[in-house]
Protein backbone atom coordinates (compact mmCIF):
# COMPACT_ATOMS: atom_id res chain seq x y z
CA UNK A 1 0.00 0.00 0.00
CA UNK A 2 2.79 2.41 0.95
CA UNK A 3 4.62 1.66 -2.29
CA UNK A 4 1.47 2.30 -4.32
CA UNK A 5 0.93 5.62 -2.48
CA UNK A 6 4.53 6.48 -3.23
CA UNK A 7 3.91 5.81 -6.93
CA UNK A 8 0.87 8.08 -6.87
CA UNK A 9 2.75 10.85 -5.06
CA UNK A 10 5.66 10.60 -7.46
CA UNK A 11 3.34 10.81 -10.45
CA UNK A 12 1.60 13.83 -8.89
CA UNK A 13 4.88 15.65 -8.40
CA UNK A 14 6.08 14.89 -11.93
CA UNK A 15 2.79 15.96 -13.50
CA UNK A 16 2.74 19.08 -11.36
CA UNK A 17 6.18 20.08 -12.56
CA UNK A 18 5.23 19.49 -16.18
CA UNK A 19 2.00 21.43 -15.82
CA UNK A 20 3.81 24.32 -14.13
CA UNK A 21 6.00 24.86 -17.16
CA UNK A 22 3.13 26.35 -19.17
CA UNK A 23 1.87 29.85 -18.38
CA UNK A 24 -1.83 29.20 -18.84
CA UNK A 25 -2.08 25.41 -18.75
CA UNK A 26 -4.30 23.92 -16.07
CA UNK A 27 -2.96 20.98 -14.10
CA UNK A 28 -4.44 17.49 -14.41
CA UNK A 29 -7.81 16.96 -12.79
CA UNK A 30 -8.53 14.31 -10.15
CA UNK A 31 -9.97 11.87 -12.68
CA UNK A 32 -6.87 12.08 -14.87
CA UNK A 33 -4.60 11.52 -11.88
CA UNK A 34 -6.64 8.54 -10.76
CA UNK A 35 -6.48 7.05 -14.24
CA UNK A 36 -2.73 7.57 -14.42
CA UNK A 37 -2.32 6.08 -10.96
CA UNK A 38 -4.28 2.97 -11.95
CA UNK A 39 -2.28 2.63 -15.15
CA UNK A 40 1.05 3.00 -13.38
CA UNK A 41 0.16 0.55 -10.62
CA UNK A 42 -1.27 -2.01 -13.04
CA UNK A 43 1.58 -1.81 -15.52
CA UNK A 44 4.60 -1.09 -13.37
CA UNK A 45 3.53 -2.57 -10.05
CA UNK A 46 4.92 -0.15 -7.46
CA UNK A 47 7.00 2.94 -6.86
CA UNK A 48 10.33 1.19 -7.24
CA UNK A 49 9.36 -0.12 -10.67
CA UNK A 50 8.08 3.30 -11.64
CA UNK A 51 11.33 4.94 -10.53
CA UNK A 52 13.24 2.37 -12.56
CA UNK A 53 11.08 3.08 -15.59
CA UNK A 54 11.54 6.84 -15.28
CA UNK A 55 15.24 6.32 -14.81
CA UNK A 56 15.28 4.59 -18.20
CA UNK A 57 13.33 7.33 -19.96
CA UNK A 58 16.42 9.01 -21.36
CA UNK A 59 17.71 5.70 -22.68
CA UNK A 60 14.44 4.93 -24.44
CA UNK A 61 13.91 8.44 -25.82
CA UNK A 62 15.90 7.79 -28.99
CA UNK A 63 13.95 4.62 -29.69
CA UNK A 64 10.65 6.37 -29.00
CA UNK A 65 11.32 8.94 -31.73
CA UNK A 66 11.68 6.08 -34.20
CA UNK A 67 9.35 3.09 -33.89
CA UNK A 68 10.89 -0.34 -34.03
CA UNK A 69 9.73 -2.34 -37.05
CA UNK A 70 9.26 -6.11 -37.21
CA UNK A 71 8.33 -7.95 -40.41
CA UNK A 72 6.87 -11.41 -39.79
CA UNK A 73 6.72 -13.37 -43.04
CA UNK A 74 5.03 -16.74 -43.52
CA UNK A 75 5.97 -19.00 -46.43
CA UNK A 76 3.26 -20.15 -48.88
CA UNK A 77 0.45 -19.17 -46.49
CA UNK A 78 -2.90 -18.63 -48.18
CA UNK A 79 -5.19 -15.72 -47.45
CA UNK A 80 -7.76 -18.19 -46.15
CA UNK A 81 -5.53 -20.05 -43.70
CA UNK A 82 -6.24 -18.05 -40.56
CA UNK A 83 -9.41 -18.24 -38.51
CA UNK A 84 -9.72 -14.45 -38.64
CA UNK A 85 -9.73 -14.68 -42.44
CA UNK A 86 -12.51 -17.24 -42.40
CA UNK A 87 -10.97 -20.70 -42.14
CA UNK A 88 -13.64 -22.97 -40.63
CA UNK A 89 -11.43 -25.37 -38.65
CA UNK A 90 -8.19 -23.52 -37.92
CA UNK A 91 -8.08 -22.68 -34.23
CA UNK A 92 -7.86 -18.94 -33.43
CA UNK A 93 -4.45 -17.97 -32.12
CA UNK A 94 -2.26 -15.01 -31.34
CA UNK A 95 -2.04 -13.88 -34.97
CA UNK A 96 -5.83 -13.61 -34.95
CA UNK A 97 -5.55 -11.54 -31.77
CA UNK A 98 -3.10 -9.19 -33.50
CA UNK A 99 -5.54 -8.91 -36.40
CA UNK A 100 -8.40 -8.04 -34.07
CA UNK A 101 -6.34 -5.51 -32.14
CA UNK A 102 -4.58 -4.11 -35.21
CA UNK A 103 -5.55 -3.32 -38.78
CA UNK A 104 -6.49 -6.30 -40.96
CA UNK A 105 -6.52 -5.80 -44.70
CA UNK A 106 -8.82 -7.84 -46.93
CA UNK A 107 -7.07 -6.85 -50.17
CA UNK A 108 -3.41 -7.59 -49.53
CA UNK A 109 -1.32 -8.46 -52.59
CA UNK A 110 2.09 -10.06 -53.06
CA UNK A 111 4.59 -8.66 -55.56
CA UNK A 112 4.76 -12.03 -57.31
CA UNK A 113 3.25 -15.49 -56.94
CA UNK A 114 6.54 -17.43 -56.51
CA UNK A 115 9.09 -17.39 -53.68
CA UNK A 116 12.21 -15.63 -55.00
CA UNK A 117 10.58 -12.81 -56.98
CA UNK A 118 7.97 -12.19 -54.28
CA UNK A 119 10.70 -11.88 -51.64
CA UNK A 120 12.79 -9.59 -53.82
CA UNK A 121 9.69 -7.41 -54.18
CA UNK A 122 9.32 -7.26 -50.39
CA UNK A 123 12.91 -6.32 -49.61
CA UNK A 124 13.25 -3.80 -52.47
CA UNK A 125 9.72 -2.42 -52.88
CA UNK A 126 10.07 -2.97 -56.63
CA UNK A 127 8.53 -5.43 -59.04
CA UNK A 128 10.88 -8.24 -60.11
CA UNK A 129 10.77 -7.12 -63.75
CA UNK A 130 12.49 -3.90 -62.64
CA UNK A 131 15.12 -5.61 -60.51
CA UNK A 132 15.89 -8.40 -62.99
CA UNK A 133 14.74 -11.17 -60.64
CA UNK A 134 13.31 -13.30 -63.43
CA UNK A 135 14.60 -15.54 -66.22
CA UNK A 136 14.00 -18.97 -67.66
CA UNK A 137 14.03 -20.10 -64.05
CA UNK A 138 11.66 -18.44 -61.59
CA UNK A 139 13.78 -18.79 -58.43
CA UNK A 140 17.38 -18.64 -57.23
CA UNK A 141 18.71 -22.20 -57.01
CA UNK A 142 21.63 -23.41 -54.85
CA UNK A 143 23.81 -23.43 -57.98
CA UNK A 144 22.80 -19.96 -59.23
CA UNK A 145 25.89 -17.73 -59.26
CA UNK A 146 23.93 -14.50 -59.00
CA UNK A 147 21.76 -12.97 -56.29
CA UNK A 148 19.62 -9.92 -55.71
CA UNK A 149 21.47 -7.25 -57.74
CA UNK A 150 23.79 -5.08 -55.68
CA UNK A 151 22.39 -1.87 -57.15
CA UNK A 152 19.06 -2.63 -55.47
CA UNK A 153 18.62 -1.04 -52.04
CA UNK A 154 17.26 -3.58 -49.57
CA UNK A 155 14.93 -2.78 -46.71
CA UNK A 156 17.81 -3.50 -44.32
CA UNK A 157 20.12 -1.06 -46.09
CA UNK A 158 17.39 1.59 -46.14
CA UNK A 159 16.62 1.13 -42.44
CA UNK A 160 20.32 1.31 -41.54
CA UNK A 161 20.41 4.60 -43.38
CA UNK A 162 17.52 5.74 -41.17
CA UNK A 163 19.51 4.95 -38.02
CA UNK A 164 18.25 1.45 -37.30
CA UNK A 165 20.03 -1.70 -36.17
CA UNK A 166 18.91 -4.49 -38.49
CA UNK A 167 18.42 -8.22 -38.00
CA UNK A 168 17.19 -11.22 -39.93
CA UNK A 169 16.40 -14.91 -39.35
CA UNK A 170 14.77 -17.61 -41.46
CA UNK A 171 14.27 -18.11 -45.17
CA UNK A 172 16.28 -15.85 -47.49
CA UNK A 173 16.05 -17.27 -51.05
CA UNK A 174 17.71 -14.29 -52.73
CA UNK A 175 21.04 -15.86 -53.62
CA UNK A 176 23.86 -17.73 -51.86
CA UNK A 177 27.32 -18.11 -53.43
CA UNK A 178 29.04 -16.62 -56.46
CA UNK A 179 32.47 -18.17 -57.03
CA UNK A 180 32.81 -21.01 -54.51
CA UNK A 181 30.72 -23.25 -52.28
CA UNK A 182 31.31 -21.05 -49.25
CA UNK A 183 31.86 -17.41 -50.29
CA UNK A 184 28.31 -16.40 -49.29
CA UNK A 185 28.45 -13.41 -51.61
CA UNK A 186 24.67 -13.00 -51.80
CA UNK A 187 23.70 -13.86 -48.23
CA UNK A 188 21.81 -11.40 -46.00
CA UNK A 189 24.92 -10.39 -44.03
CA UNK A 190 26.10 -8.71 -47.23
CA UNK A 191 22.78 -6.95 -47.85
CA UNK A 192 22.52 -4.63 -44.87
CA UNK A 193 21.71 -6.89 -41.93
CA UNK A 194 23.81 -6.26 -38.81
CA UNK A 195 22.65 -9.48 -37.20
CA UNK A 196 21.83 -12.69 -39.07
CA UNK A 197 20.83 -15.64 -36.92
CA UNK A 198 19.82 -19.08 -38.10
CA UNK A 199 18.74 -18.83 -41.70
CA UNK A 200 17.81 -20.93 -44.71
CA UNK A 201 19.65 -19.47 -47.71
CA UNK A 202 17.54 -21.58 -50.07
CA UNK A 203 14.55 -22.54 -47.96
CA UNK A 204 12.47 -25.50 -46.93
CA UNK A 205 10.93 -27.74 -49.59
CA UNK A 206 9.48 -31.20 -49.99
CA UNK A 207 13.04 -32.30 -50.83
CA UNK A 208 14.01 -31.48 -47.24
CA UNK A 209 11.48 -33.84 -45.69
CA UNK A 210 13.17 -35.88 -42.96
CA UNK A 211 10.15 -38.06 -42.08
CA UNK A 212 10.32 -40.38 -45.10
CA UNK A 213 6.92 -39.16 -46.27
CA UNK A 214 8.11 -37.54 -49.51
CA UNK A 215 11.44 -39.31 -50.05
CA UNK A 216 13.85 -41.63 -48.27
CA UNK A 217 16.56 -39.08 -47.53
CA UNK A 218 16.70 -35.27 -47.58
CA UNK A 219 18.43 -33.76 -50.60
CA UNK A 220 21.67 -32.25 -49.32
CA UNK A 221 21.90 -30.06 -52.42
CA UNK A 222 18.86 -28.08 -51.29
CA UNK A 223 18.58 -28.41 -47.53
CA UNK A 224 21.05 -26.52 -45.38
CA UNK A 225 20.86 -24.33 -42.31
CA UNK A 226 23.25 -21.43 -41.77
CA UNK A 227 24.08 -19.23 -38.82
CA UNK A 228 25.08 -15.85 -40.19
CA UNK A 229 27.10 -16.87 -43.27
CA UNK A 230 28.30 -20.26 -42.04
CA UNK A 231 26.67 -23.63 -42.66
CA UNK A 232 25.76 -25.34 -39.38
CA UNK A 233 23.59 -28.24 -40.56
CA UNK A 234 23.17 -30.08 -43.86
CA UNK A 235 20.50 -31.34 -44.20
CA UNK A 236 18.84 -29.45 -41.37
CA UNK A 237 16.67 -30.93 -38.65
CA UNK A 238 13.12 -29.62 -38.87
CA UNK A 239 12.18 -30.17 -35.26
CA UNK A 240 13.32 -27.23 -33.21
CA UNK A 241 13.87 -24.96 -36.24
CA UNK A 242 11.01 -22.61 -35.37
CA UNK A 243 12.28 -22.35 -31.81
CA UNK A 244 15.77 -21.46 -33.08
CA UNK A 245 14.33 -18.62 -35.14
CA UNK A 246 12.24 -17.47 -32.19
CA UNK A 247 15.16 -17.52 -29.76
CA UNK A 248 17.39 -15.61 -32.18
CA UNK A 249 14.67 -12.98 -32.56
CA UNK A 250 14.09 -12.67 -28.82
CA UNK A 251 17.83 -12.28 -28.25
CA UNK A 252 18.09 -9.60 -30.93
CA UNK A 253 15.22 -7.63 -29.39
CA UNK A 254 16.67 -7.84 -25.89
CA UNK A 255 20.07 -6.71 -27.18
CA UNK A 256 18.54 -3.65 -28.84
CA UNK A 257 15.89 -2.47 -26.39
CA UNK A 258 17.42 0.99 -26.09
CA UNK A 259 17.81 1.76 -29.78
CA UNK A 260 15.57 1.54 -32.84
CA UNK A 261 15.69 -1.76 -34.66
CA UNK A 262 14.30 -3.48 -37.74
CA UNK A 263 13.85 -7.25 -37.55
CA UNK A 264 12.93 -9.52 -40.48
CA UNK A 265 11.57 -12.87 -39.25
CA UNK A 266 11.05 -15.13 -42.25
CA UNK A 267 9.50 -18.40 -41.10
CA UNK A 268 9.94 -21.78 -42.79
CA UNK A 269 6.26 -22.43 -42.07
CA UNK A 270 3.96 -23.04 -43.98
CA UNK A 271 5.94 -24.41 -46.92
CA UNK A 272 5.91 -28.15 -47.57
CA UNK A 273 7.40 -30.25 -46.18
CA UNK A 274 5.27 -29.60 -43.15
CA UNK A 275 6.86 -29.98 -39.74
CA UNK A 276 6.16 -29.22 -36.12
CA UNK A 277 7.67 -30.08 -32.76
CA UNK A 278 6.21 -32.75 -30.50
CA UNK A 279 4.36 -30.09 -28.48
CA UNK A 280 2.23 -29.25 -31.52
CA UNK A 281 2.00 -32.54 -33.37
CA UNK A 282 -1.60 -33.78 -33.64
CA UNK A 283 -3.00 -30.80 -31.71
CA UNK A 284 -5.08 -29.14 -34.45
CA UNK A 285 -8.35 -30.50 -35.71
CA UNK A 286 -7.23 -29.23 -39.11
CA UNK A 287 -4.39 -31.77 -39.16
CA UNK A 288 -0.70 -31.33 -39.97
CA UNK A 289 -1.15 -27.94 -41.58
CA UNK A 290 -2.98 -26.69 -38.52
CA UNK A 291 -0.24 -28.07 -36.26
CA UNK A 292 2.34 -26.10 -38.25
CA UNK A 293 0.37 -22.90 -38.07
CA UNK A 294 -0.11 -23.24 -34.32
CA UNK A 295 3.65 -23.68 -33.82
CA UNK A 296 4.42 -20.54 -35.81
CA UNK A 297 1.65 -18.71 -33.97
CA UNK A 298 3.15 -19.50 -30.57
CA UNK A 299 6.59 -18.33 -31.70
CA UNK A 300 5.06 -15.02 -32.76
CA UNK A 301 3.28 -14.69 -29.42
CA UNK A 302 6.55 -15.22 -27.57
CA UNK A 303 8.27 -12.60 -29.74
CA UNK A 304 5.55 -10.06 -28.96
CA UNK A 305 5.67 -11.01 -25.27
CA UNK A 306 9.35 -10.03 -25.32
CA UNK A 307 8.33 -6.58 -26.57
CA UNK A 308 5.79 -6.28 -23.75
CA UNK A 309 8.24 -7.47 -21.10
CA UNK A 310 10.71 -4.81 -22.22
CA UNK A 311 8.02 -2.11 -22.42
CA UNK A 312 8.57 -1.42 -26.11
CA UNK A 313 5.43 -3.00 -27.52
CA UNK A 314 3.71 0.36 -27.98
CA UNK A 315 6.77 1.65 -29.84
CA UNK A 316 6.95 -1.28 -32.25
CA UNK A 317 4.98 -1.66 -35.46
CA UNK A 318 4.57 -5.25 -36.65
CA UNK A 319 3.73 -6.34 -40.19
CA UNK A 320 2.47 -9.90 -40.65
CA UNK A 321 1.98 -11.30 -44.13
CA UNK A 322 2.90 -14.12 -46.53
CA UNK A 323 5.22 -14.15 -49.53
CA UNK A 324 2.38 -15.20 -51.88
CA UNK A 325 -0.59 -17.55 -52.18
CA UNK A 326 -0.79 -21.23 -51.15
CA UNK A 327 0.80 -24.17 -52.95
CA UNK A 328 -2.35 -26.07 -53.87
CA UNK A 329 -0.52 -28.89 -55.65
CA UNK A 330 0.50 -30.27 -52.27
CA UNK A 331 -3.07 -31.29 -51.59
CA UNK A 332 -3.66 -31.72 -47.86
CA UNK A 333 -0.27 -30.15 -47.13
CA UNK A 334 -1.07 -26.96 -49.03
CA UNK A 335 -2.77 -23.82 -47.79
CA UNK A 336 -6.18 -22.27 -48.38
CA UNK A 337 -6.87 -19.47 -50.87
CA UNK A 338 -10.38 -18.93 -49.47
CA UNK A 339 -12.80 -18.05 -52.30
CA UNK A 340 -10.01 -17.04 -54.65
CA UNK A 341 -9.16 -19.01 -57.76
CA UNK A 342 -5.72 -20.48 -58.36
CA UNK A 343 -2.67 -20.52 -56.13
CA UNK A 344 1.09 -20.24 -55.99
CA UNK A 345 2.71 -19.56 -59.35
CA UNK A 346 -0.46 -18.27 -60.98
CA UNK A 347 -1.87 -14.87 -61.88
CA UNK A 348 -5.34 -15.73 -60.62
CA UNK A 349 -6.19 -13.96 -57.37
CA UNK A 350 -5.34 -17.03 -55.30
CA UNK A 351 -1.69 -16.71 -56.28
CA UNK A 352 -1.39 -13.11 -55.12
CA UNK A 353 -3.88 -12.56 -52.29
CA UNK A 354 -2.18 -12.73 -48.90
CA UNK A 355 -3.03 -12.17 -45.24
CA UNK A 356 -1.93 -8.65 -44.31
CA UNK A 357 -2.00 -7.44 -40.72
CA UNK A 358 -0.39 -4.34 -39.20
CA UNK A 359 -0.22 -4.21 -35.41
CA UNK A 360 0.90 -1.18 -33.42
CA UNK A 361 -0.82 -1.00 -30.03
CA UNK A 362 -1.83 2.49 -29.00
CA UNK A 363 -1.15 3.97 -32.42
CA UNK A 364 -3.08 2.02 -35.05
CA UNK A 365 -6.78 1.77 -34.27
CA UNK A 366 -8.24 -1.75 -34.49
CA UNK A 367 -10.28 -2.36 -37.59
CA UNK A 368 -10.70 -3.95 -41.00
CA UNK A 369 -9.63 -2.17 -44.18
CA UNK A 370 -10.74 -3.02 -47.70
CA UNK A 371 -8.08 -0.81 -49.28
CA UNK A 372 -5.58 -2.35 -51.71
CA UNK A 373 -2.13 -2.80 -50.16
CA UNK A 374 0.90 -4.76 -51.31
CA UNK A 375 3.90 -6.42 -49.71
CA UNK A 376 6.03 -3.91 -51.65
CA UNK A 377 4.57 -1.12 -49.50
CA UNK A 378 6.32 -2.32 -46.35
CA UNK A 379 9.75 -0.86 -47.16
CA UNK A 380 8.36 2.58 -48.07
CA UNK A 381 6.18 2.65 -44.97
CA UNK A 382 8.92 1.50 -42.60
CA UNK A 383 11.48 3.97 -43.92
CA UNK A 384 8.97 6.83 -43.70
CA UNK A 385 8.05 5.94 -40.11
CA UNK A 386 11.78 5.95 -39.36
CA UNK A 387 12.01 9.54 -40.52
CA UNK A 388 13.89 8.85 -43.73
CA UNK A 389 13.15 8.34 -47.41
CA UNK A 390 14.00 5.93 -50.20
CA UNK A 391 16.36 6.84 -53.05
CA UNK A 392 14.78 9.06 -55.69
CA UNK A 393 16.78 7.71 -58.63
CA UNK A 394 14.41 4.81 -59.33
CA UNK A 395 10.73 3.92 -59.54
CA UNK A 396 9.20 2.22 -56.51
CA UNK A 397 6.05 0.14 -56.91
CA UNK A 398 5.57 0.11 -53.15
CA UNK A 399 3.90 3.14 -51.60
CA UNK A 400 3.96 4.57 -48.10
CA UNK A 401 0.89 3.46 -46.14
CA UNK A 402 1.33 5.83 -43.20
CA UNK A 403 -1.89 7.76 -43.84
CA UNK A 404 -3.78 4.54 -44.51
CA UNK A 405 -2.61 3.07 -41.21
CA UNK A 406 -2.93 6.13 -39.00
CA UNK A 407 -5.72 8.15 -40.60
CA UNK A 408 -7.82 5.64 -42.49
CA UNK A 409 -6.96 7.27 -45.81
CA UNK A 410 -7.61 5.66 -49.17
CA UNK A 411 -5.03 3.39 -50.77
CA UNK A 412 -2.29 5.02 -52.84
CA UNK A 413 -2.78 2.23 -55.39
CA UNK A 414 -5.08 2.82 -58.34
CA UNK A 415 -3.92 -0.29 -60.17
CA UNK A 416 -1.93 -3.50 -59.80
CA UNK A 417 0.11 -5.42 -62.38
CA UNK A 418 0.37 -9.23 -62.36
CA UNK A 419 3.61 -10.50 -63.89
CA UNK A 420 4.88 -13.98 -64.60
CA UNK A 421 8.62 -13.58 -65.17
CA UNK A 422 8.67 -10.64 -67.63
CA UNK A 423 5.22 -11.36 -69.07
CA UNK A 424 2.32 -9.13 -68.10
CA UNK A 425 -0.51 -11.57 -67.42
CA UNK A 426 -3.20 -9.32 -65.97
CA UNK A 427 -3.96 -5.80 -64.74
CA UNK A 428 -6.30 -4.61 -62.02
CA UNK A 429 -7.75 -1.11 -62.28
CA UNK A 430 -10.14 -0.19 -59.49
CA UNK A 431 -12.43 -3.14 -58.91
CA UNK A 432 -11.90 -4.59 -62.40
CA UNK A 433 -9.28 -7.11 -63.46
CA UNK A 434 -8.33 -7.82 -67.06
CA UNK A 435 -6.58 -11.11 -67.90
CA UNK A 436 -4.46 -11.13 -71.06
CA UNK A 437 -3.13 -14.62 -70.32
CA UNK A 438 -4.32 -17.26 -67.86
CA UNK A 439 -2.84 -20.50 -66.58
CA UNK A 440 -4.98 -23.61 -66.58
CA UNK A 441 -6.61 -23.86 -63.19
CA UNK A 442 -7.49 -27.35 -61.94
CA UNK A 443 -10.92 -27.76 -60.44
CA UNK A 444 -11.30 -29.03 -56.89
CA UNK A 445 -12.48 -32.36 -58.32
CA UNK A 446 -9.36 -32.60 -60.46
CA UNK A 447 -7.22 -31.75 -57.45
CA UNK A 448 -8.87 -34.57 -55.54
CA UNK A 449 -8.12 -37.05 -58.30
CA UNK A 450 -4.45 -36.12 -58.16
CA UNK A 451 -4.09 -36.60 -54.43
CA UNK A 452 -3.49 -40.02 -52.89
CA UNK A 453 -4.63 -40.01 -49.28
CA UNK A 454 -4.20 -36.25 -49.12
CA UNK A 455 -0.69 -36.30 -50.60
CA UNK A 456 0.36 -35.38 -54.16
CA UNK A 457 1.29 -37.86 -56.84
CA UNK A 458 4.90 -37.54 -57.98
CA UNK A 459 3.99 -36.23 -61.43
CA UNK A 460 1.37 -33.73 -60.34
CA UNK A 461 1.98 -30.02 -60.74
CA UNK A 462 -0.38 -27.13 -61.36
CA UNK A 463 0.31 -24.93 -64.34
CA UNK A 464 2.58 -22.10 -63.25
CA UNK A 465 4.06 -21.46 -66.69
CA UNK A 466 4.11 -18.03 -68.27
CA UNK A 467 3.58 -19.40 -71.77
CA UNK A 468 3.07 -22.76 -73.44
CA UNK A 469 0.41 -25.43 -73.66
CA UNK A 470 -1.23 -24.71 -70.31
CA UNK A 471 -1.43 -20.95 -70.87
CA UNK A 472 -4.32 -19.37 -72.77
CA UNK A 473 -4.03 -15.96 -74.42
CA UNK A 474 -7.07 -13.68 -74.40
CA UNK A 475 -7.60 -10.98 -77.04
CA UNK A 476 -9.65 -9.13 -76.07
CA UNK A 477 -8.85 -9.79 -72.41
CA UNK A 478 -11.34 -11.49 -70.14
CA UNK A 479 -12.61 -9.15 -67.45
CA UNK A 480 -13.87 -9.71 -63.90
CA UNK A 481 -15.53 -7.46 -61.36
CA UNK A 482 -13.58 -8.44 -58.23
CA UNK A 483 -16.08 -6.87 -55.85
CA UNK A 484 -19.02 -8.86 -57.17
CA UNK A 485 -16.99 -11.89 -58.23
CA UNK A 486 -13.77 -12.22 -56.18
CA UNK A 487 -13.47 -15.86 -57.22
CA UNK A 488 -13.13 -14.87 -60.89
CA UNK A 489 -15.83 -17.27 -61.99
CA UNK A 490 -18.03 -15.08 -64.20
CA UNK A 491 -16.34 -13.04 -66.94
CA UNK A 492 -18.10 -9.84 -67.92
CA UNK A 493 -19.68 -9.69 -71.35
CA UNK A 494 -17.88 -7.58 -73.98
CA UNK A 495 -20.64 -5.01 -74.00
CA UNK A 496 -20.24 -4.43 -70.29
CA UNK A 497 -16.69 -3.24 -70.03
CA UNK A 498 -15.60 -1.21 -73.05
CA UNK A 499 -15.14 1.86 -70.87
CA UNK A 500 -13.18 -0.16 -68.31
CA UNK A 501 -10.86 -1.50 -70.99
CA UNK A 502 -9.97 2.07 -71.92
CA UNK A 503 -8.85 2.69 -68.32
CA UNK A 504 -6.86 -0.56 -68.38
CA UNK A 505 -5.09 0.46 -71.58
CA UNK A 506 -4.30 3.88 -70.10
CA UNK A 507 -2.85 2.25 -66.97
CA UNK A 508 -0.66 -0.03 -69.07
CA UNK A 509 0.53 2.89 -71.19
CA UNK A 510 1.56 4.85 -68.07
CA UNK A 511 3.22 1.75 -66.63
CA UNK A 512 5.16 1.05 -69.83
CA UNK A 513 6.27 4.68 -70.12
CA UNK A 514 8.15 4.59 -66.82
CA UNK A 515 9.26 0.95 -66.96
CA UNK A 516 12.99 0.23 -67.08
CA UNK A 517 13.30 -3.54 -67.40
CA UNK A 518 16.10 -5.11 -65.38
CA UNK A 519 18.59 -7.57 -66.85
CA UNK A 520 17.50 -11.13 -65.88
CA UNK A 521 19.68 -12.72 -63.18
CA UNK A 522 18.18 -16.17 -62.58
CA UNK A 523 19.89 -18.19 -65.31
CA UNK A 524 23.60 -18.20 -64.42
CA UNK A 525 24.65 -21.62 -63.08
CA UNK A 526 27.73 -23.32 -61.66
CA UNK A 527 27.20 -26.59 -59.82
CA UNK A 528 30.54 -26.28 -58.04
CA UNK A 529 29.14 -23.50 -55.83
CA UNK A 530 26.44 -25.65 -54.19
CA UNK A 531 26.96 -25.33 -50.42
CA UNK A 532 28.71 -28.30 -48.83
CA UNK A 533 29.50 -28.25 -45.13
CA UNK A 534 32.02 -31.13 -45.33
CA UNK A 535 32.90 -33.02 -48.54
CA UNK A 536 34.43 -35.84 -46.47
CA UNK A 537 30.98 -36.75 -45.13
CA UNK A 538 29.17 -36.26 -48.46
CA UNK A 539 27.91 -32.89 -47.23
CA UNK A 540 26.10 -34.28 -44.19
CA UNK A 541 26.90 -32.60 -40.88
CA UNK A 542 25.52 -30.81 -37.86
CA UNK A 543 27.39 -28.18 -35.91
CA UNK A 544 24.45 -26.70 -34.02
CA UNK A 545 24.86 -28.97 -30.98
CA UNK A 546 21.14 -29.00 -30.31
CA UNK A 547 20.10 -31.38 -27.51
CA UNK A 548 19.11 -34.76 -28.89
CA UNK A 549 20.07 -33.85 -32.45
CA UNK A 550 23.75 -34.74 -32.62
CA UNK A 551 23.04 -38.49 -32.47
CA UNK A 552 20.53 -38.16 -35.30
CA UNK A 553 23.07 -36.44 -37.52
CA UNK A 554 25.74 -38.98 -36.70
CA UNK A 555 23.39 -41.66 -38.01
CA UNK A 556 22.91 -39.64 -41.21
CA UNK A 557 26.66 -39.17 -41.57
CA UNK A 558 27.19 -42.92 -41.22
CA UNK A 559 24.60 -43.56 -43.93
CA UNK A 560 26.22 -40.98 -46.17
CA UNK A 561 29.67 -42.48 -45.75
CA UNK A 562 28.40 -46.01 -46.30
CA UNK A 563 25.95 -45.58 -49.16
CA UNK A 564 26.23 -42.02 -50.39
CA UNK A 565 23.29 -39.65 -50.45
CA UNK A 566 21.06 -38.31 -53.24
CA UNK A 567 22.76 -35.56 -55.21
Swiss-Prot record:
Catalysed reactions, as listed in the record: an aryl sulfate + H2O = a phenol + sulfate + H(+)
Pfam families assigned: Sulfatase, Sulfatase_C
Signal sequence bounds: 1-19
CDD domains reported for this sequence: spARS_like
Enzyme class: hydrolase
Glycosylated residues in this chain: 179, 228, 542
InterPro entries: Alkaline_phosphatase_core_sf, Sulfatase, Sulfatase_CS, Sulfatase_N
Active site: 115 (nucleophile), 173
Principal localisation: secreted
Keyword Iron-sulfur appears in the UniProt entry: no
PTM-bearing positions, type 3-oxoalanine (Cys): 115
UniProt entry keywords in alphabetical sequence: Calcium, Glycoprotein, Hydrolase, Metal-binding, Secreted, Signal
Residue ranges of coiled coil: none
Cofactor (UniProt): Ca(2+)
Cofactor comment text: Binds 1 Ca(2+) ion per subunit.
UniProt xrefs under PROSITE patterns: SULFATASE_1 (PS00523), SULFATASE_2 (PS00149)
Enzyme Commission no: 3.1.6.1
Entry comment describing in which tissues the protein is expressed: Expression is confined to aboral ectoderm cells and their precursors.
Family recorded in the similarity comment: Belongs to the sulfatase family.
Name this polypeptide is given: Arylsulfatase
Amino acid sequence: MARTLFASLFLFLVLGLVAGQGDDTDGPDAESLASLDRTATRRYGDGEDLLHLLGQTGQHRTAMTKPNVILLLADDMGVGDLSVYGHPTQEPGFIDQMANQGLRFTQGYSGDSVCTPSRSAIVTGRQPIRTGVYGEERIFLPWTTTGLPLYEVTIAEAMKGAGYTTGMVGKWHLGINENSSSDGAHLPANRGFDFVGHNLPFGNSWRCDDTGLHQDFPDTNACFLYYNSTSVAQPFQHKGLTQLLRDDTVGFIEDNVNKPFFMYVSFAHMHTSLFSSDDFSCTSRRGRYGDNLREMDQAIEQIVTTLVDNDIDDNTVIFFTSDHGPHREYCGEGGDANVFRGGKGQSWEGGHRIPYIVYWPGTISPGVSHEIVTSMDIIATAVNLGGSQLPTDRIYDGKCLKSVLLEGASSPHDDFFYYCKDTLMAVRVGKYKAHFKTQTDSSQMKLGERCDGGFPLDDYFLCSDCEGDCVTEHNPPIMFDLEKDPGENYPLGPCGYEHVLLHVKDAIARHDAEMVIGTPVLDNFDFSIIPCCNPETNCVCNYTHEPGVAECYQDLINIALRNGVPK
